[in-house]
């Protein structure tokens, strides 16, 4: 079984950060992200998923080359055609919106711009640790 890899973006507004975008799933808030297609790089995957799930295109954002976040956690293999559990890799890039854009919701129940007011308690599995890692990164940069 090949390790599932999911890639996405944390999209922020403002400099310094004023807010960040999360997508509403039926039971949780999450990033615009998805699985890498064959022949696709991780960054290409993240950009494709961002466009598909929000309507935000590469020209709308400025990717921060100094930050990326990786997390690994166990998921049921039945989602990927197997049995038992398998380790999944999540890779998240940071990008700032250059200009206001209209969010087009295609695969979720909605979206929300959350205010940047650490500490955040939104979703234990991935979002909270991503935001904590970004907060530490920003403190080191200043």
State each model region's role.
Residues 1-19:
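Conserved N-terminal beta-strand and adjoining loop/helix that marks the start
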Residues 36-127:
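Unchanged
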Residues 30-34:
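A short gly/proline-enriched turn/hairpin at secondary-structure junctions
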Residues 27-28, 119:
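Short, solvent-exposed loop/turn segments at secondary-structure junctions
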Residues 120-142:
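Charged phosphate-binding loop/patch that engages nucleotide di/tri-phosphates or the phosphate backbone
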Residues 21-24:
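Short, acidic/hydrophobic/Gly-rich beta-strand patch recurrent on exposed beta strands
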